[in-house]
Amino acid sequence: MEGKAADPLLCDSLILWLQTFNTAAPCRNVQDLTNGVAMAQVLHQIDVAWFDASWLNRIKEDVGDNWRIKSSNLKKILQGIMDYYHEFLDQQISEELIPDLNKISENSDPTELGRLMQLILGCAVNCERKQEHIQNIMTLEESVQHVVMTAIQELMSKEAMGPSASDVSSEMEQQLKKALEDLQEAIAEKEELAQRCQELDLQVAALQDEKNSLVSENEILNDRLEQLDDSLDDPNTVVAKKYFHAQLQLEQLQEENFRLEAAKDDYRVHCEDLEKQLIELQHRNNELTSLAEESRALKDENDILRAAADKASKLESTVEVYRKKLQDLNDFRRQVKSLQETNMMYMHNTVSLEDELREANAARAQLETYKRQVQELHNKLSEESKRADKLAFEMKRLEEKHEALVKEKERLVIQCDALKETNEELRYSQMQQDHLSRTDASRIKSHDNLAAELLPVEYREMFIQLQHENKMLLLQQEGSENERIMELQKQLEQKQWTVNELGTEKRLNKERIGELQQQIEDLQKTLQEQGSKTEGSSNLKQKLAAHMEKLSEVHDELQKKEAALAELQPDVSQNPQKIGELEAALRKKDEDMKAMEERYKMYLEKARNVIKTLDPKLNPASAEIMLLRKQITERDKKIEALEAEYKLAKLRDYEENLIVTAWYNKSLTLQKLGMEARLLGSGGACRDGPGRSFLAQQRHVTNTRRNLPVKVPSATSD
């Protein structure tokens, strides 16, 4: 008996019995039952009052591969069963029938799982609705019924023995187990503490060694310091000379430090301007970050909708498989019912033949008793015996014929099943051909009607709800795109306004340069008309020489700024902050140019006043004036080149922003097209291609998305 209960056949038979309850959780194999959800639902159906909804809610459904949660669910189920036996049925469960839950949750042991399902079977056959559950057991196969009945007998026999003599021993065993568990925990804690002490000892030893090494190094450094002090006291030593030389270098470095501090103040002002620009760029970056977060949120929602659509398609295929299995099950039940009726008819025939055989034997006994008295009865008895032999022969012949008919029937049933499968395949192929031969409009309509009939009501509602959410998302996305377009238009207007300002400044600079050239020409004419004296020409030469030195300084400063500007030339697509630095450097350069122009005007006024006072007759400074004019033209060319580079940098930035915006808009459009194609489902599939599967449709949408051209608007130059 115990060998049968522990056999895996018991587990498989009880799984078939659990499937008669039609639970929401799957219970097809051992892996489906290890989490305990299906068994808890079966107990809830067995006795709703005892295993109520609150008890059922304590069983966690989202278990996954976590064996601890599985073990917790199984412990709750076993505790509920033991309470039901003890309090409701007033029975005690034998220790041999209690399963090992750890083996079930960790190893999916079918033997221990069979013991647990055997206890659930005991609850079913002892509850108030036991007749209904016994009727359900009788509907199973004969072999499964035999295994289930054997398990019930084993359960009843072990419950009948009772644990009256083993209560004390079981309590002692439990106390002993608990004491052993406490002892193991204490030993584990002791080992952990010992390991921790060993680690601390190693750390203390390492710190002690480090301390000793530091003390020795400190002593060595003190000795070296004393030697250096002794050597510095003597001025003739090499160390003293090096010390004095170091003092001189220190003074020079201090003077250079003063100069660097002055330059630092200038750079501090420049840094403040850059910080202001950085704050503005940070505000702009925050706005772009918020827009990026919104786009990521929309992308996440799109992924969720895509996952929901995939899940819906998988559930549809699962429903189709279950529907086919249900049809096969109904056919099998009808066949079993017809076989049972035939078996009952054969049993009635056998009983009638046995009754006739008993009557013949009784008649034979009577004929033997009256054989000596009546000879006629003897003859009659012989005739009856012959008749009985004939009937026995006929019965044997009928049995052989019955066996042949049974075999022929089995063969015909197998052929019938094969013909049914062939018929189903031919019908399915015929339906496909009819479906391919219809027109596009009728094909779309029939496909939609078939999908509507196959889809359950809850999936239809979910599909309609997803369509509504898709429309709402499209409206929201269009609003966000309009806002993005408005912002880009504002930025474009601001850029154009900045370009216009720069053009105005350039025109004013050209006018100023023209005025300066006119002043130089006037000065040259005045010098040619009036001439110069020797003393006045020497003073004018000194003034012009000073002026030329300052112009050379300005030219050197301009070259330095050009070098700094070349170093600050950014990669606009990678670091927009460098663009701000370049603009700040350009503005500072313009300010420096304005300051140089003011100084130049001041020098011209001074030179004109000197010329008027001296009234020269000669023109010795014409060469210097021509050189000055040439330097001014070179400076104008450099200014124009820098302005052109600045415009190119701004145009490059503007083009990249437009490319990013166009790519963003195009990706959103493609995502909307892909979402609409997936949500339209079969309708879109019929329009695209009549014989295309779901995966082929997805590949077609992906290829269409890749083949769509991306148009980037060209940047307009001012």
From Swiss-Prot:
Q: Which PROSITE patterns match?
A: CH
The protein's organism comes out as Gallus gallus (Chicken)
- What CDD domains does its record include? HkD_Hook1 (cd22225)
Kindly state which keywords UniProt assigns to this record, in alphabetical order: Coiled coil, Cytoplasm, Cytoskeleton, Microtubule, Protein transport, Transport
UniProt cross-references to InterPro entries, sorted A to Z? CH_dom (IPR001715), CH_dom_sf (IPR036872), Hook_C (IPR008636), HOOK_N (IPR043936)
Coiled-coil annotation reads 164-428, 473-652
Q: Name one GO molecular function term.
A: dynein light intermediate chain binding
Signal sequence coordinates? none
Q: Which SUPFAM superfamilies match?
A: Hook domain (SSF116907)
Q: Where in the cell is it found?
A: Cytoplasm; Cytoplasm, Cytoskeleton
Q: One Pfam family name from the record? A: HOOK
Q: Establish whether keyword Transport is in the entry.
A: yes
User: Which residue range or ranges hold the Calponin-homology (CH) domain?
Assistant: 8-124
Family statement drawn from the similarity comment of this UniProt entry:
Belongs to the hook family.
Q: What does this protein do?
A: May function to promote vesicle trafficking and/or fusion.
This protein's encoding gene: HOOK1
**Assembly state and interactors?**
Interacts with microtubules.
Instruction: List, in alphabetical order, the GO biological process terms annotated in this UniProt record.
Output: cytoplasmic microtubule organization; cytoskeleton-dependent intracellular transport; early endosome to late endosome transport; endosome organization; endosome to lysosome transport; lysosome organization; protein transport
Q: Give GO cellular component annotations, separated by semicolons.
A: centrosome; cytoplasm; FHF complex; microtubule
What is the protein's major site of localization? cytoplasm
Instruction: Give the protein's recorded name.
Output: Protein Hook homolog 1
